[in-house]
Amino acid sequence: MRKDERERDTPAMRSPPPPPPPATATAASPPESLRNGYVKSCVSPLRQDPPRSFFFHLCRFCNVEPPAASLRAGARLSLAALAAFVLAALLGAGPERWAAAATGLRTLLSACSLSLSPLFSIACAFFFLTCFLTRAQRGPDRGAGSWWLLALPACCYLGDFAAWQWWSWLRGEPAAAAAGRLCLVLSCVGLLTLAPRVRLRHGVLVLLFAGLVWWVSFSGLGALPPALRPLLSCLVGGAGCLLALGLDHFFHVRGASPPPRSASTADEKVPVIRPRRRSSCVSLGESAAGYYGSGKMFRRPSLPCISREQMILWDWDLKQWCKPHYQNSGGGNGVDLSVLNEARNMVSDLLIDPSLPPQVISSLRSISSLMGAFSGSCRPKINSFTPFPGFYPCSEVEDPVEKGDRKLHKGLSSKPSFPTAQLRRSSGASGLLTSEHHSRWDRSGGKRPYQELSVSSHGCHLNGPFSSNLMTIPKQRSSSVSLTHHAGLRRAGALPSPSLLNSSSHVPVSAGCLTNRSPVGFLDTSDFLTKPSVTLHRSLGSVSSAADFHQYLRNSDSSLCSSCGHQILKYVSTCEPDGTDHHNEKSGEEDSTVFSKERLNIVETQEEETVKEDCRELFLEGDDHLMEEAQQPNIDQEVLLDPMLVEDYDSLIEKMSNWNFQIFELVEKMGEKSGRILSQVMYTLFQDTGLLETFKIPTQEFMNYFRALENGYRDIPYHNRVHATDVLHAVWYLTTRPIPGLQQLHNNHETETKADSDARLSSGQIAYLSSKSCCIPDKSYGCLSSNIPALELMALYVAAAMHDYDHPGRTNAFLVATNAPQAVLYNDRSVLENHHAASAWNLYLSRPEYNFLLNLDHMEFKRFRFLVIEAILATDLKKHFDFLAEFNAKANDVNSNGIEWSSENDRLLVCQVCIKLADINGPAKDRDLHLRWTEGIVNEFYEQGDEEATLGLPISPFMDRSSPQLAKLQESFITHIVGPLCNSYDAAGLLPGQWIEAEEGDDTESDDDDDDDDDDDDDDDEELDSDDEETEDNLNPKPQRRKGRRRIFCQLMHHLTENHKIWKEIIEEEEKCKAEGNKLQVDNASLPQADEIQVIEEADEEEEQMFE
């Protein structure tokens, strides 16, 4: 380091370093302009297409470019002047001259009519030959060696003309004269080809060409005088050559090298901004001395790449907070190798452990390689006990959809992934890595708790004497388009929710330190150096315990990241220290160590309010209407809604509280307003569950979107808005009604619904919902809404409303067979389901007034969108048995621990099975509703069968109108699809129902019914329970025996069983009638013809008597 820099850094060593420079000053200084990821450059503009005219196509055919506009304008003026001159000459002549001219013209035309075609052919031949030879012989001086072609017509014809005039012997014998004249022509042409050094093959071509065109002139121009033939041939041939050379001279031939640009054309380049080249941390374009004194940095191409912006940020932060340690960097002092080797040894010990996940092992190997690279380089010596700060305002959680072959949201394993491991040490003697498994989404539904999404410098700080913090190299992730659109919609709407929810109660604490993992993605660090909206407030301080050092971040405001387009957070430290005591675990060596750590200070209230007001004005600028709506409570906006939503709320919610919701009666009652049934039911359910207040959903935007959504459903027999409303009602019923025997994890519904909506964002709380129209009778009942967070249930309800959006009334197989655009777009996989999800989200992102989720923060919206898409894709019946097998393995397998409500994967699986059951709930309704839904699906099937027959395709099963098989369709559907799904869902204890007292003989009757229906799983369990109870009573006799045991009555299973029984009876009757008809036909076929006729007559007489 230079002397002046050391002198400038001396005051910083005596006092705490100043706060980071403001972003405005940073952006104004010249050196800071190099800290972003882009550079200015210039590129040549794209060449505009030439005009598409007849002349353009002619030039393209001739392999030349058309002339410029100025040349074309000059040519037009010349032709106009020539036409005017000819017209004036004709008008100036008298009638006598006109008659003589007409006679001469007729004579000329009659003479030329026979010779015009040969002359034109000769001209074209010379034109194309000249074009070919000009292109073949083009050199650096373009066209300079091609003008000899103008003498080619003269050699072909003028020599023949001179011989005809001077040598009389050529006029004798025609054959001998023709041969002599041809030899003369070929001799002249051969001498001509020797002058410009023509290639041999080109010379031979010219000789053959000369002989051919001479023969055409000799044989085709018989109508002209002999002396005139060579002259006209030479004239038209010269014209063709001259035209070809002129085109080559004045116009640029395509494919030729462009002429050298003059100095003035350099200014025609367009200025652009392009991204810098991504390279490793040691190849940043600047010398190592500019960053780390005079130390030399060796490039290691095998290491992962760190962006230029990240390296600049790290170095800038070091210069601000670690300046006292730069004083010895000029002397070549680097990192303390003993500390680095100790850290490498610890990593090596961790790698020996075979129980570590593969992700952790790969990350530890990367860290070991990094430390090996650092040990061979000379760097400034950094205090080992000073936290190395890293900034992650735009951290992105891993999306399980993008994990390729990994199966995160399905399956029995829910192990967390470690995209980037950070060196952590325990204070114990073993020194092993302590990793905690966090499986709960803290309200926002992030992949990790928000302690793990906070700044990595507040992570695990080593308590040993050789502690040090190392840089991590996270994997760069691409930004999500959906989140970018969501952030864009927020700018047009109200201000988002001010903070994220952090739940410290769900984060286990290890013995030595809290386990933190680095987030997956880095923000473009130029945002921190150039933008005033991303300001870090820091001060140095010392704390005596590790608990005081642990602070997480809350989002006090939001802005947009310039590198990925996501909504980023402005960090303000407002969290409390963790309650776990860490200093009791310290060893004797650690007691003598004093840590100097960084802490984030709380920003003054006045400054924070000012920044919030500025951001609010930025988001709501130019949209006063949306700003007023966002500031008004939802209750004030009800005046904008349909009155039916408010007036008939009680009666509607009372009807919907029944599983057999008479939705078709509601459609008939609404009449003309039946097109709004989905939005009205959706609004009623959100009011009932309190989701509007919980997530601060603006009512007007909510109604705007769902009215537009229901308008997107087509008027088809089954997959219409009424079906979507029925599925929505089913998922609401299954998640809010009492379930016998379900254990509730959260019972404080009343407190949560009555509390202020901002309280849901405070630490340690997760929002749950409960239905206002339903109460839990006693502790023997539970509810799914008590075990699934409100955000996930809201995603389930929205997915139910979206799940068949823009359904065409055809199956996936039909779209694939007909090569529909959707099938091609989605590669024949879950075509309709992908189309429903994509179209519904595209509708949401299309207009700002549809953004009813504007108060969800970045992580909540990402989680919400993921859940909605997964729920919609789960409705694909092609994947039905995969989901069913996975659900049985999780919930009903003997070796399984059952559903873990703390696992987000298990909760997602339950929601997927729930919406699948709601989507095919028709057979589980009462008989009348079931028949109405059956009529709709059959009519839709018949329409597809008719179209298949029209297209010449094989008609799909059960879709042939000419051979209806309604009973077989429903019986097969219940037996193979609906029945197993309902049985598995019931066996898992998730179906709503009620406890009833079982009477004597119930078991026997239920056993008989189950034998008929092939559904005896429940009663087998009941028999096992009864056997266990009898054994227990025998071993421990009690003074009083209960008279009977309670059973669960489920309305859904009851209707399913009854409908299945009825369809089976119908099938048996049809088969019986069919067998009797076949038997009658066989008997009739065995009788004589007369007897057969007599039987038919008798039957007719009997029928006539019956009708009489």
Curated annotation (Swiss-Prot):
The positions making up the signal sequence are none
Q: Which residues bind Mg(2+) 1?
A: 723, 803-804, 919
A molecular function annotated in GO for this UniProt entry is: phosphoprotein binding
Which parts of the sequence bind AMP? 719, 804, 919, 970
Q: Where are the transmembrane segments?
A: 73-93, 114-134, 144-164, 175-195, 204-224, 231-251
Assembly behavior: Homodimer. Interacts with PIK3CG; regulates PDE3B activity and thereby cAMP levels in cells. Interacts with RAPGEF3 and PIK3R6; form a signaling complex that regulates phosphatidylinositol 3-kinase gamma in angiogenesis. Interacts with ABHD15; this interaction regulates PDE3B's stability and expression and, thereby, impacts the antilipolytic action of insulin.
**Descriptive protein name:** cGMP-inhibited 3',5'-cyclic phosphodiesterase 3B
Organism, as annotated: Rattus norvegicus
